[in-house]
């Protein structure tokens, strides 16, 4: 499955992210982490998906996320993982909807990973082979970035 996304590594491009997502009532979110630090934050609206590289954006990216998410709800899968890291950066979303918890409450399946939920409810096969790849390396490959964007696309 191909995923269209914008990879954001410089502060100048954050204004485009803001313009695209500012009117959205909620934002689809996922993260990729390396050594207890957020490397990527994937953000999606109705149309666009953005991958913010916090290793490149640094404090500017963190401040941007604090401001954007403080007034937005987020939707994601297994958000307790993402929230642990977001909170450690002082990023506190306005509201949270976790599709893993929703799946558990519905009780239609006994497995609740994104891979299992996507297959059960959407009939989509997700390859999670890159989940444990090296997110801390200096340059991420196209396959890693596509993998990162895919979770947001599926949850959306």
Per-region residue spans from a language model:
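A polyampholytic, Gly/Pro-enriched intrinsically disordered region
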Residues: 114-127
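Acidic, Mg2+-coordinating catalytic module of metal-dependent nucleases/exonucleases
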Residues: 126-156
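Conserved RNase H-like, two-metal-ion catalytic cores of nucleic-acid enzymes
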Residues: 1-116
């Amino acid at each position: 499955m191909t995923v269209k996304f914008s990879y954001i590594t410089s502060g100048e491009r954050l204004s485009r992210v803001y313009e695209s997502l500012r009117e959205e009532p909620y934002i689809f979110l996922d993260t990729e982490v390396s050594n207890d630090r957020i490397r990527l934050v994937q953000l999606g609206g109705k149309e666009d998906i953005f991958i913010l590289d916090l290793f490149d954006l640094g404090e500017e990216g963190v401040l941007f996320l604090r401001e954007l998410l403080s007034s937005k709800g987020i939707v994601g899968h297994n958000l307790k993982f993402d929230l642990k890291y977001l909170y450690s950066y002082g990023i506190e979303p306005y509201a949270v909807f976790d599709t893993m918890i929703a799946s558990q409450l519905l009780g239609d399946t006994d497995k609740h990973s994104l891979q299992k939920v996507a297959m059960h409810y959407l009939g989509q096969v997700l390859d999670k082979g890159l989940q444990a790849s090296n997110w801390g390396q200096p340059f991420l490959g196209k396959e890693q970035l596509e993998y990162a964007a895919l979770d947001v696309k599926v949850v959306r």
